[in-house]
Each structure stands twice: as structure tokens, then as C-alpha cells.
Amino acid sequence: MNTERTLVLIKPDGVRRGLIGEIISRFERKGLKIKALKMLRLTREKAEEFYSVHRGKPFFVSLIEFMTSGPIIAMILEGDMAISVVRRMIGPTDGREAPPGTIRGDYSLSKSQNVVHASDSPESAMREIRVIFKDDEIIDW
């Protein structure tokens, strides 16, 4: 077994549309363990730090504006190959191309407002978790 941790964000559009419970339930039904969970509102500084890999890209400013437009849900999920499992569950970035049955395929109609974010590699997961969570917010059980 290859136990991994990954970070998932339910973005402001997912929170506004009341999709929190549905999205969390999908991950739980898959057998992923929630190690940390909180609602927060990203500051501009925290959003820029989180999405620093996209700094300088044409969509960076609008991404930061969107991610700071309302509350988000942040969670750490753990399980066997959690990063790739979660990425398959959420579907491609562009919700218009995501197949039905994926979170984005079922709930997203665009590339920019695509309901969820999930870490794409072990390195990204470690960095993103450190940006959003303090060590004492992560529960081992």
C-alpha cells in the first residue's frame, strides 16, 4: 500500500452552490480518510502564495480574485495512492471536458470556476498543505 496525503479545496463556487456535503461524501465513500478539514476565506497574500506556480500567467489575477471572492473548504485526505485517486475523481481542469461521474463533470461548466482543487503531485501536496494548515490542525487517527 502507498499511503499518501493530498490537499483538496472546495472553491468559492462549490461553497456558494451548496456542494460541500456532496463532495466530501464522495471522498468518504471512496474510502479516503479526512485528516484535517476547515472553512476559511483566503487572503490575497495566502492565495498568491498558494498559486505561486501560476504567477505571471495570463489567468493569475482572475484566479486570485476568484479564490478570494468567498469562503472555501480545505481538507487533507489520506489513503492508498490518494493523489491520483482524487485527481481521477475530480476530473480534468476544464469542467466542460470532464466526464460525467467526476466532480467537475457533474458540477462545473467552465475552466475557471471548476468547483475543486486537488494537489497534482506529492511535492505539490506537501507545499500546499503547509500553506493552508498548521501541524496541530492535522489529526492522526
Curated annotation (Swiss-Prot):
Cofactor(s) needed: Mg(2+)
Record GO biological process: CTP biosynthetic process; GTP biosynthetic process; UTP biosynthetic process
Gene Ontology CC: one annotated term: cytoplasm
Localisation: Cytoplasm
Top EC class, one word: transferase
Entry's EC annotation: 2.7.4.6
CDD domains: NDPk_I (cd04413)
SMART domains: NDK (SM00562)
Gene Ontology MF, one: ATP binding
PROSITE patterns: NDPK, NDPK_LIKE
UniProt catalytic activity: a 2'-deoxyribonucleoside 5'-diphosphate + ATP = a 2'-deoxyribonucleoside 5'-triphosphate + ADP; a ribonucleoside 5'-diphosphate + ATP = a ribonucleoside 5'-triphosphate + ADP
Catalytic residues identified in the record: 117 (pros-phosphohistidine intermediate)
Keyword S-adenosyl-L-methionine: no
Function: Major role in the synthesis of nucleoside triphosphates other than ATP. The ATP gamma phosphate is transferred to the NDP beta phosphate via a ping-pong mechanism, using a phosphorylated active-site intermediate.
Similarity annotation: Belongs to the NDK family.
Name of the protein described by the UniProt record: Nucleoside diphosphate kinase
Organism: Staphylothermus marinus (strain ATCC 43588 / DSM 3639 / JCM 9404 / F1)
Gene name tied to this protein: ndk
